[in-house]
């Protein structure tokens, strides 16, 4: 029994939600999102909340149950408040800058890395060593942040590279003479 799936998802103030078949749509101050729930899961509106139940007690239905509830919850939070992911750059000469709609990264390569920011995502560079990725879709914000981090992930000896804000890098000891 999914402890997460059992709880109904309350529709926050300022968000209008509708359920049409297996599609949940939400509209809020930040924008509009929809999520198609898996066929193994039943979804319905009850008393200003969205309720998610498994169609039967099969393993697949139970495995999709909690995930579907969380995805619907993320849609509501996204259209109301949005999501944000911060990245930090550390290393000599490593920096970031916005160039129009593209993010330009100097990460120690012989060339500049230019990242084309997808639609629906906003990237800001408050400092040359800090990147802030924001948007209404939690999955897309996380994916963009992961793609930026992938260009030069933090290395374990000096900690140089792109890392998430607050991420702890497990450091290794260098060679001994």
Swiss-Prot record:
Recorded hits in PROSITE patterns, A to Z, give: RIBOSOMAL_L6_1 (PS00525)
Any single GO CC term annotated in Swiss-Prot or TrEMBL for this entry: cytosolic large ribosomal subunit
Note whether Ribonucleoprotein occurs among the keywords: yes
Q: Name one GO biological process term.
A: cytoplasmic translation
Q: Cross-referenced InterPro entries, in alphabetical order? A: Ribosomal_uL6-like, Ribosomal_uL6-like_a/b-dom_sf, Ribosomal_uL6_a/b-dom, Ribosomal_uL6_bac-type, Ribosomal_uL6_CS
Provide this UniProt record's keywords sorted from A to Z: Ribonucleoprotein, Ribosomal protein, RNA-binding, rRNA-binding
What GO terms are given for molecular function? Answer: rRNA binding; structural constituent of ribosome
State if Nucleotide-binding is listed as a keyword. no
Q: How does it associate, per the subunit comment?
A: Part of the 50S ribosomal subunit.
| Purpose | This protein binds to the 23S rRNA, and is important in its secondary structure. It is located near the subunit interface in the base of the L7/L12 stalk, and near the tRNA binding site of the peptidyltransferase center.
Entry similarity comment: Belongs to the universal ribosomal protein uL6 family.
What name has this protein been given in UniProt? Large ribosomal subunit protein uL6
Which species?
Answer: Brucella melitensis biotype 1 (strain ATCC 23456 / CCUG 17765 / NCTC 10094 / 16M)
Gene behind the chain: rplF
């Amino acid at each position: 029994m999914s402890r997460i799936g059992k709880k109904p998802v309350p529709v926050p103030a300022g968000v209008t939600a509708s359920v049409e078949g297996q599609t949940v749509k939400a509209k809020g101050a930040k924008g509009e999102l929809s999520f198609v729930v898996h066929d193994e899961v039943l979804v319905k509106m009850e008393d200003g909340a969205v309720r998610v139940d498994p169609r039967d007690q099969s393993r697949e239905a139970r495995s999709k149950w909690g995930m579907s509830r969380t995805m619907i919850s993320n849609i509501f939070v996204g259209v109301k408040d949005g999501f944000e992911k911060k990245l930090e750059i550390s290393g000599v000469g490593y920096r970031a800058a916005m160039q129009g709609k593209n993010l330009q990264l100097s990460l120690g390569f012989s060339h500049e890395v230019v990242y084309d920011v997808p639609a629906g995502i906003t990237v800001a560079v408050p400092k040359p060593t800090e990147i802030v990725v924001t948007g209404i879709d939690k999955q897309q914000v996380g994916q963009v942040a992961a793609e930026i981090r992938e260009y030069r992930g933090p290395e374990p000896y000096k900690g140089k590279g792109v890392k998430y804000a607050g991420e702890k890098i497990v450091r290794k000891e260098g060679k001994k003479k």
